[in-house]
Amino acid sequence: MIKKTLNKNKKKTSLKNKIIKKSNQDFSALKKYLRVVNFIAAAQLYLKDNFFLERELRSEDIKTRLLGHWGGATGVNFLLSHLNFYLKENQKTNPKLRDIIFLLGPGHAFPALQANLFLEKTLSFYFDNQDKNIKNIYDFNLSYNKEGLTHLIKNFGSPAGFPTHASPVTPGAILEGGELGYSISNASGAVMDNK
């Protein structure tokens, strides 16, 4: 009897250790992802050259006109990375999680959303599958590589590049906002619509 109990405890401990090991690996990957999206968001906001810090930063590498808010971007990145992690882990067991709508209130935190869309490869998929008219307007490479990331960072907030807020060319965007009030009223409407 004692031997059976010891074997059961060993099996439980082994399973517990496997779960802890997997959780630690997932958490480590999540932390790395968060650092990368924060870097991409910061680079979009502040850098006009030397995007990969291949040499020391110089004053001419910094944008003279800043469009966006770094403080909002870090919060959005934290929320999106953890939400995506949670959804990835739980959508199979809870199909209702597929109905989540993400509303971005602080419009000037758009570089964070755009960084996440790039890393999850949504931007490249979206622009590769657009009709000819959209491709003529946004004629640049958004491949999931160094060249694509360079285009993303360099063209943020430029006249022929990416807007500084979510817009109709943002994958998944249903309307353009910029202030917290818009997202609160849209969230209220979505809840009332889905009673």
List each model region and its residues.
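Cofactor-/ligand-binding subdomain signature composed of acidic, glycine-rich
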Residues: 2-69
